[in-house]
């Protein structure tokens, strides 16, 4: 794969033989972003789990203290009073059968889906579309609920869901390159806390195998997975 001159220059600033602290990695990621727009900052983790085994699945949600830098588009499957509640809460689209039909037709212009429990039978018809994309409402992530107001507010406020893929990897957005270093470290710390809390008891050996921080179209910065405390040490902004 051919990389741009800017990418190669950015990659040259990263010492591949070194594992950086989260504060160092954030600083380096911000310094090496070369795109002309506000790049997204993402953390990728390789976990020591076998997601093919039900007792080693890692999934959950995390509330990013500073949000993702993007207002999530949220749809809600609800009817009657709950539909009105969802509209009042700021949901981008609200409906039942018509929403299902649109998704069956290929529409996927949203970041999260919420449903009241009575709508789940209908949503089952699009589970094969939503599931692989991490968009299927689920009680474990608080997206199958009667409290649609709270669910919409949480997601709009920076709550994101995570789920390990079949290769034992996790990918989570922790903000934008325009965020301050301390904001990005705070968001990284929140993610790390939840990933560690979600460790399955059946997982054996080293849990956090590899952690990398990247910006859109930028090189990865390797983070020391053993640094899980005092994450803001050495941060230029405290």
Curated annotation (Swiss-Prot):
Q: Which family does it belong to?
A: Belongs to the universal ribosomal protein uL1 family.
List the Gene Ontology MF annotations in alphabetical order: rRNA binding; structural constituent of ribosome; tRNA binding
Chain's role: Binds directly to 23S rRNA. The L1 stalk is quite mobile in the ribosome, and is involved in E site tRNA release.
Which SUPFAM superfamilies does its entry note?
Ribosomal protein L1
Q: Name one Pfam family in it.
A: Ribosomal_L1
Name the chain's protein.
Large ribosomal subunit protein uL1
- Quick check: keyword rRNA-binding in the entry? yes
Matching entries from Gene3D superfamilies are given as: 3.30.190.20, 3.40.50.790
Organism, per UniProt? Salinispora tropica (strain ATCC BAA-916 / DSM 44818 / JCM 13857 / NBRC 105044 / CNB-440)
Q: How does it assemble?
A: Part of the 50S ribosomal subunit.
Query: What Gene Ontology cellular-component terms does the record carry?
Result: large ribosomal subunit
Q: Can you list the disulfide-bonded cysteine pairs?
A: none
* Gene Ontology BP term (one): regulation of translation
Q: Which UniProt keywords apply?
A: Repressor, Ribonucleoprotein, Ribosomal protein, RNA-binding, rRNA-binding, Translation regulation, tRNA-binding
């Amino acid at each position: 794969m051919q990389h741009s001159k800017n990418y190669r220059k950015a990659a040259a600033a990263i010492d591949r033989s070194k594992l950086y602290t989260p504060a160092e990695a954030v600083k380096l990621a911000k310094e090496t972003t070369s795109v002309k727009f506000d790049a997204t900052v993402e953390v990728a983790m390789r976990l020591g789990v076998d997601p093919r085994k039900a007792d080693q699945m890692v999934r959950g949600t995390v509330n990013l203290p500073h949000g993702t830098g993007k207002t999530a588009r949220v749809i809600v499957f609800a009817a009657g009073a709950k539909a009105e509640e969802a509209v009042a809460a700021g949901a981008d689209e609200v409906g039942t059968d018509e929403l299902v039909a649109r998704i069956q037709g290929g529409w996927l212009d949203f970041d999260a889906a919420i449903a009241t429990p009575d709508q789940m039978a209908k949503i089952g018809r699009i589970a094969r579309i939503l599931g692989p994309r991490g968009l299927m409402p689920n009680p474990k992530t608080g997206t199958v609920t009667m409290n649609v107001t709270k669910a919409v507010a949480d997601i709009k406020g920076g709550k994101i869901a995570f789920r390990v893929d079949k290769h034992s990897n996790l990918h989570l957005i922790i903000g934008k390159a325009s965020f301050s270093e301390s904001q990005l470290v705070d968001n990284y710390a929140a993610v790390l806390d939840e990933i560690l809390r979600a460790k399955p008891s059946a997982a054996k050996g080293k849990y956090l195998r590899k952690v990398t921080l990247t910006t859109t179209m930028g090189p990865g910065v390797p983070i020391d997975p053993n640094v899980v405390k005092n994450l803001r040490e050495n941060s230029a902004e405290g």
